């Protein structure tokens, strides 16, 4: 409850709300959802139960809080399409780098608005403020006498920013632009 000032009295209340939000957005089992880590701090059987209630094809980028269920023999890894610590995918001709942790020098960052780095981990904390400061300063770099803008498209996909619902890349981009 204290982390991120989440509005839930209990973990069960939070889980119920997050599952409802997920299934409100993810309508079909062919919809793909990339989870950027810290999916569950529970045991394997608890994680299996939650995953079985969620629609769509699920992909996991591992986070620091996922190790408990990942190491549990009861965990059914087949509930995810894949489990990786890092991935690069494409979405409508845009390169998307996926990591639990923000990567300030990511593959493809000089490609402009066709390359994005999506991350989690930092929630809405001082670490996030530091990443935002880096992005803003990178976009206003000065090389010699000319001002040159780097397209530093790091997007914090903290679930609290989206009311705990999965979002499309376009939705995350719009939220990031509105926040800037």
Language-model segments: residues:
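Extended recognition/assembly regions associated with phosphoester-bond processing machinery
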Residues: 1-36, 40-180
């Amino acid at each position: 409850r204290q982390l991120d000032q989440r509005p839930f009295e209990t973990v069960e209340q939070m889980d119920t709300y997050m599952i409802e939000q997920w299934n409100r957005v993810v309508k079909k089992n062919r919809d793909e959802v990339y989870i950027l880590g810290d999916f569950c701090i529970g045991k394997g059987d608890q994680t299996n139960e939650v995953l079985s209630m969620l629609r769509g094809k699920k992909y996991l980028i591992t986070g620091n809080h996922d190790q408990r269920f990942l190491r549990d023999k009861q965990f059914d890894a087949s509930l995810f399409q894949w489990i990786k610590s890092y991935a690069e995918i494409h979405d409508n001709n845009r390169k998307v780098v996926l990591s639990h942790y923000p990567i300030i020098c990511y593959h493809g960052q000089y490609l402009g608005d066709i390359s994005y780095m999506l991350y989690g981990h930092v929630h809405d904390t001082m670490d996030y403020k530091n990443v935002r400061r880096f992005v803003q300063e990178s976009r206003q770099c000065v090389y010699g006498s000319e001002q040159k803008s780097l397209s530093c498209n790091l997007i914090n996909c903290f679930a609290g920013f989206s009311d705990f619902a999965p979002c499309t890349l376009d939705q995350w981009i719009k939220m990031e632009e509105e926040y800037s």
